[in-house]
Amino acid sequence: MEPSLLMWGFFTFTMIPGCMAGACVQQPPSLRNATFKILGYKVGTTLNCDCQRGFRRDPSSGPYMICRGNSSHSFWENKCQCMPTSSPRIPVKQVTPRPEEQKERKTTETQGQMQPPNQANLPGHCKEPPPWEHESLKRVYHFMEGQTVRYQCLPGFRDGSAQNNSAQSVCKKQEDQEVMRWTQPKLKCKSEKENGSFPEPQMSTAAPPTTKTSLPTRTKGTTDSQNLTEVPATMQPIIFTTQYQLAVAGCVLLLLSILLLSGLTWQRRR
C-alpha cells in the first residue's frame, strides 16, 4: 500500500471519530406519506462527499464537508470534488442510471428530505451546502445533538395524530445510553378522503312542486296596452267518463225523436 494511502487512512481513523462524537449516525426516521425539512444545520454537522456511479472522490478534497462557526457566523468547510474512475485519456461515457436507481431517486425525492425554498439564518446553523458536480443522488449527513427536523404530510394527506409537536424529531442522547438517536415523530398522515372529508352528493327526496301556469285575465276598464293581471290557475285534464257519454247519447236520441214526431205531425195536417 502506498504511503499516501496509509497516511490518509490514519487521518480518517483519527479525525472522523472525533467529529462524530455527539452525533446521530443514523438518518432521521422515514414516515409514510410524509417528508421532512431542515431549517438549518447545527455547527458540527458533517456531509459525506459521495459521488455518482463511475466517479470517485478527488483525493485532493476531504472525505466530508463540516459546518463550522459560532452563534454569529457559520459556514461549510471543505469542498467536495468528484473525478472519473477511469483513466483521463479514455473518454468517460455518461452513465445512465439503471431503473432501480431511478426508482430509488424518485422515492428519496418523495419521502426523503425536502428543503424549504428560503432557509432562515438561524444562529449557530449552516444553510444547505452547495451541490458539486457528479455528486451522489442521496446525501448522507451526520447530525449533531439538538438537531431538529420537521415533518409534513404530502399533498392529499393530513395529520390525524391530533398531538402537539407530533411533526418533529430531535437528535438527542437516550436515557442510560451513550449513543445519540432520533426521537420518533408521532405524525400520522391519513388520506383526506377518509372519514367523509369529501361527502357524496345526496339525492333529494322532496316531492316536485305542482306545475302551475299563469293565465292573463283582463280587468274591467283596462285596455290592451295596459298591464294584464296574472291569476294562477291549475290546469286539470278533461276526463270523459262513461256516464257522461251515455247522457250525451240520450240527449241526441231525444232530439232525433222530437224531430221525427214533428215531421210526422206536419205531414198529417197537410
Curated annotation (Swiss-Prot):
What are the Sushi domain coordinates in residue numbering? Answer: 22-84, 124-191
Q: How does it sit in the membrane?
A: Single-pass type I membrane protein
Where do the segments described as Disordered lie? 87-124, 190-225
Q: Which cysteines are joined by disulfide bonds?
A: 24-67, 49-80, 51-82, 126-171, 153-189
Top-level taxon = Eukaryota
Q: Does the keyword Transmembrane helix apply?
A: yes
Q: Which PROSITE patterns match?
A: SUSHI (PS50923)
> A single GO molecular function, which one?
interleukin-2 receptor activity
Q: Compositionally biased, Polar residues: which spans?
A: 112-121, 202-225
Biological process GO terms, please?
A: immune system process; inflammatory response
> Which sequence ranges are marked TM in the entry?
246-264
- Residues with an annotated glycan are 33, 70, 164, 195, 227
Q: What spans does the record annotate as topological domain Extracellular, numbered to this chain?
A: 22-245
Compositionally biased region (Basic and acidic residues): 98-108
Instruction: Tell me the compartments it is located in.
Output: Membrane
Look up the signal peptide feature and give its range.
1-21
Record bears the keyword Transmembrane helix: yes
Q: Which residues lie on this side of the membrane: Cytoplasmic?
A: 265-270
What's a single GO CC term here?
A: membrane
| Alphabetically ordered keywords of this record | Disulfide bond, Glycoprotein, Immunity, Membrane, Receptor, Repeat, Signal, Sushi, Transmembrane, Transmembrane helix
Subunit-structure text: Non-covalent dimer of an alpha and a beta subunit. IL2R exists in 3 different forms: a high affinity dimer, an intermediate affinity monomer (beta subunit), and a low affinity monomer (alpha subunit). The high and intermediate affinity forms also associate with a gamma subunit.
Function field: Receptor for interleukin-2. The receptor is involved in the regulation of immune tolerance by controlling regulatory T cells (TREGs) activity. TREGs suppress the activation and expansion of autoreactive T-cells.
Name of the featured protein: Interleukin-2 receptor subunit alpha
What is the organism of origin for this protein? Sus scrofa
What lineage is on file? Eukaryota, Metazoa, Chordata, Craniata, Vertebrata
